Amino acid sequence: MSLLTLFPAILSFIAVSVPDEGRDMYDAFVNKLANSFVSVSYEYETEISGVKVVGEGNLFLQGRCYRYDADGLTVCSDSRSIWIADQAAREMVIEPVDESSLAVNPATLLVNLAGAFTVKSTKKAGDGVVIYHLLPAVSFGISECSITLAASGTQGASCAAPVLQKASFITDDGIAFSLVIKSVTFEEPSRSPEFFLPSGTDSDWVVTDLR
């Protein structure tokens, strides 16, 4: 699976076991995330075979549905199926949601909050800012992860919930991936499943439907 397709896991694979320091902010973030339509704009950086790779993307989450776009790759799910579209190649693969695979269906954990991550430790990084070091409770391609949350009103956080500022993770094969969150917005969860479906395809596209 592409590194880019792991990003929703950073938001979704969240355990409820948190050390006392930062617990209230962490719980508030999880609750807001699970009960909102969430929009995230981010920049990412990684290194593959000695080559630095940078890019940016946008992610939308609501319950078990999600859609994100990053450098020509679009991945969508309406909770029943997953669409993976390569805009440059004009190719799309459609697969059924695999309820047993956290990496394929990361948004499932927004509803269930199954403990895919446990919090190993926390560290203050400024007034109202906490770094959470996470370890996977199950195997899904990420060996370790950290997220940085800022309390509302601190260091650029302007919404009513704690804000995800940064995230980083290391895959099982040792590739490090870091993200800087440009913006996060929370709205009422009023989007229909159709909002998350892909658009802009025509008869020139090669579509492989594996459902």
Identify the function of each model-found stretch:
Residues E56-V104, G174-F177:
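An acidic-aromatic
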Residues N35-S39, V54, G63, S77-S79, ...:
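Extracytoplasmic
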Residues W83-G141:
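Surface-exposed, polar helix/loop patches in the mature regions of secreted/periplasmic/lumenal proteins
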Residues V51-V53, Q62, D69, L113-A116, ...:
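Residues that act as N-cap/strand-start positions at coil-to-secondary-structure junctions
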Residues E43-E47, D69, A85-Q87, L135-A137, ...:
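A generic structural motif
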Residues F29-K32, E56-F60, R64, D71-C76, ...:
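Short linear motifs in intrinsically disordered
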Residues G115-F117, S121-S203, T208-D209:
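Gly/Pro-enriched, hydrophobic low-complexity segments
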Residues L3, F7-V53, R64, S199-R211:
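N-terminal leader/targeting segments and the immediate start of mature chains
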